[in-house]
Amino acid sequence: MTLALVFVSNESNFTVNTVFASGLASSSAPLPASPVELGTLPAPAPAAPAMNPPIGMEISGMFNTVFSSLIKLEVSKRVNCEMSCTILEILGSTGLTSSLCDGAVVVVELKRVVIVIGEISAGVTRVFIQIEEDLFASIRKDILGAYLIDCVCC
């Protein structure tokens, strides 16, 4: 995770420097001489160019694009890891392990657990898993972090 953020950070720094350099180059173009120096009447003002978003907005958009995809990926990995790491504890605390076998075989069986639906909404993670061919469980993690089994269907 740290390595990925360092890599993205370096890429972002390069992009930020490029954006700032191009912004400064366009804003530091030489100004025309004053009409008094030229001895002529001032020319009509050119049409205003289309408004470009401020540099800060461009950078903000870039960071949103880069980091939102990384954050979604990390949240997904973390939730999957949490659910995988705690499912044995959940099944053990509800007595479902007795329908599978002893602890050593449960680990092998858990590798074949199928996640049917997973969602994250309003601070609640809910996952429906298929434990055996005709045994399903609905597991949710509440806002306080406790894992609860809502129903077991046979």
From Swiss-Prot:
Domain of life, per lineage: Eukaryota
Note: Almost completely overlaps MNP1.
Protein name listed in UniProt: Putative uncharacterized protein YGL069C
Organism: Saccharomyces cerevisiae (strain ATCC 204508 / S288c) (Baker's yeast)
